[in-house]
Design a protein with these regions (language model features):
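Amphipathic, Lys/Arg-enriched alpha-helical "gate/interface" segment within cytosolic domains
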Residues: 1-120
Length: 120
């Protein structure tokens, strides 16, 4: 499951996974951000903050995640991955080959630094 908040005045989406990601998470996320992107052209930033990656509930959740990324990565300027997870720390280096957005990793306790970077 994931929680999210769209900071409309800043154009920044905050995402906090707290359990295995579900297919419905990405439908809810798209329902929230798609109208904003349609009105504003893009998101200035996306912050993903989690102590560790919770995985996916099912194969359909994994497919929904990849589809969401494919449909939205060109519409997000920057992505901050805020985590101490060793697995997620390498995400920016891997995703850089597949995602148009600029990606940077921050330690879990550096949420404010990540938000400041997204606002640049």
């Amino acid at each position: 499951m994931m929680h999210f908040e769209l900071l409309r005045d800043r154009g920044i989406l905050l995402v906090t996974p707290d359990g295995p990601l579900e297919k419905s998470d990405f439908a809810r996320l798209a329902k929230e951000v798609d109208p904003f992107i349609a009105s504003n052209g893009r998101l200035a930033g996306l912050m993903i903050r989690t102590k560790s990656f919770p995985g996916w509930e099912s194969l359909s959740a994994l497919v929904s995640h990849f589809r969401f990324v494919a449909d939205h990565h060109r519409k997000i300027a920057r992505i901050a991955v805020v985590t101490d997870s060793e697995l997620l720390k390498i995400l920016p280096r891997i995703a850089d080959h597949f995602v148009k957005a600029e990606i940077r990793q921050f330690g879990f306790d550096r949420k404010d630094d990540a938000l400041a970077w997204l606002e640049l």
